Amino acid sequence: MDILISSLKSLGYSRTSKSLDSGPLVVHAVAGAGKSTALRKLILRHPTFTVHTLGVPDKVSIRTRGIQKPGPIPEGNFAILDEYTLDNTTRNSYQALFADPYQAPEFSLEPHFYLETSFRVPRKVADLIAGCGFDFETNSQEEGHLEITGIFKGPLLGKVIAIDEESETTLSRHGVEFVKPCQVTGLELKVVTIVSAAPIEEIGQSTAFYNAITRSKGLTYVRAGT
């Protein structure tokens, strides 16, 4: 536990007032904060840590065990579960829980540590995310390209992501290929178009919108409202 806490502090995580005696250590970080990278380094340096994820596990490597799907935990190891908010039935075997609660807020717990700074999301996109009510900032040096128009006021470029049923229906009616936010989890996309039936000022703290727009690392287009 001490090694993990020291690592979190060195990475700039902030401490909340929640007592460390209350259940597993809960750590929250926004998209692009380097959470998974930090966990991989922890495993590499300290073999007594085991990290499982409810998200996408690492590919098999000859160098390290990496982040694995849930399974047996070696006796005596400190067990960490990443993406714990994706399910509330798997967490009991773990001594630390990591997640971005904005991606799946339903099962999130009160954290002991948090980091609301992304190192990947472009500045213009980060400003839009914050403007929708999320505690979110970025240290990225990329300004990024962000264009916001009505659904029919601009082209649909790159990966098209529909964030509500009405926009799915509209895109299907016009024969446009699209994906849902859950289908791009963990991806980093150079060109993204997000389609919303609601205008941008009405989106607010939409989980679907957050999951979609945080996939962008380059050109971002939002087609929202009429």
From Swiss-Prot:
Record localization: Host cytoplasm
Domain of life where this protein originates: Viruses
Keyword Magnesium: no
Swiss-Prot/TrEMBL GO biological process terms: symbiont-mediated suppression of host innate immune response; transport of virus in host, cell to cell
Keyword terms of this UniProt record: Host cytoplasm, Host-virus interaction, Inhibition of host innate immune response by virus, RNA-binding, Suppressor of RNA silencing, Transport, Viral immunoevasion, Viral movement protein
GO molecular function: ATP binding; RNA binding
Residue ranges constituting the (+)RNA virus helicase C-terminal domain according to the UniProt record: 116-226
Segments forming domain (+)RNA virus helicase ATP-binding: 1-115
GO cellular component entries: host cell cytoplasm
Cited function: Transports viral genome to neighboring plant cells directly through plasmosdesmata, without any budding. The movement protein allows efficient cell to cell propagation, by bypassing the host cell wall barrier. Increases plasmodesma size exclusion limit. Acts as a suppressor of RNA-mediated gene silencing, also known as post-transcriptional gene silencing (PTGS), a mechanism of plant viral defense that limits the accumulation of viral RNAs.
Oligomeric and partner information: Homodimer and homooligomer. Interacts with capsid protein. Interacts with host AGO1; this interaction targets the host protein for degradation, thereby suppressing the antiviral RNA silencing.
Other observations noted: TGBp1, TGBp2 and TGBp3 seem to act together for cell-to-cell propagation. TGBp1 is the main movement protein that physically cross the plasmodesma with the viral genome. TGBp2 and TGBp3 would facilitate TGBp1 function.
Recorded family membership: Belongs to the Tymovirales TGBp1 protein family.
Protein's name in the database: Movement and silencing protein TGBp1
Species per Swiss-Prot/TrEMBL record: Potato virus X (strain X3)
